[in-house]
Amino acid sequence: MANVHVINHPLVQHKLTIIRDKNTGTKAFRELVDEVATLMAYEITRDMELEDIQVETPLQTTTAKTLTGKKLGVVPILRAGLGMQDGILKLIPAAKVGHVGLYRDHDTLEPVEYFVKLPSDVEERLFIVVDPMLATGGSAIMAIDCLKKRGARNMKFMCLVAAPEGVKALQEAHPDVEIYVAGLDEKLDENGYIRPGLGDAGDRLFGTK
């Protein structure tokens, strides 16, 4: 699939397996989601631009590399996306954080927006939009719509697991947005849940039902 990157690193896949396990408790689930987000952030920033600068080491002056180009932003889709936020910030502590609040209507399966708060300089940033699951694609599409309406021009989407239906929908709605996923799953079931999936990420992160 164009613009879809499946992160097959052994550590990512090992941790994702434990995340999927129904016997993994809330504390371990939360810690593992955080760890996988950090590992995926390493991959998602692989194409960031560098420039040469002069640095004084204790022994001499040398030419070294430093990040340049777009400033970064992280936008978790509330509430489950919060579980991935800090893992990314460990690698990119200077990134600004915005939030998009959406919930899925369990009857229509459509997302409903209830909160949006973004940095003021959205047009200058590359945003990493995060949500543990990409099911129908509705929430991701609406979140990216929200950013674009407010001036954002550069975005990537990161999730732990995705259904092919959601990937297709997001690609069709926003072909300019690259998708990074740890596990590309089999399908959506008749209730709109990813199979095999990992259950309800929000409930498992926060210990709710």
UniProtKB/Swiss-Prot annotation:
The protein's required cofactors: Mg(2+)
GO terms of molecular function: GTP binding; magnesium ion binding; uracil phosphoribosyltransferase activity
Reaction it catalyzes: UMP + diphosphate = 5-phospho-alpha-D-ribose 1-diphosphate + uracil
Note on how the cofactor is bound: Binds 1 Mg(2+) ion per subunit. The magnesium is bound as Mg-PRPP.
One biological process term in Gene Ontology: UMP salvage
Regulation (activators, inhibitors): Allosterically activated by GTP.
Pfam families registered for this protein in UniProt: UPRTase
Keyword list, A-Z: Allosteric enzyme, Glycosyltransferase, GTP-binding, Magnesium, Nucleotide-binding, Transferase
EC number: 2.4.2.9
UniProt: uracil binding residues: I194, G199, D200, A201
Transmembrane intervals: none
Residues at which 5-phospho-alpha-D-ribose 1-diphosphate binds: R79, R104, D131, P132, M133, L134, A135, T136, G137, G138, S139, D200
NCBIfam families assigned: PRK00129.1, upp
General function of this protein: Catalyzes the conversion of uracil and 5-phospho-alpha-D-ribose 1-diphosphate (PRPP) to UMP and diphosphate.
Protein's recorded name: Uracil phosphoribosyltransferase
Native organism: Listeria innocua serovar 6a (strain ATCC BAA-680 / CLIP 11262)
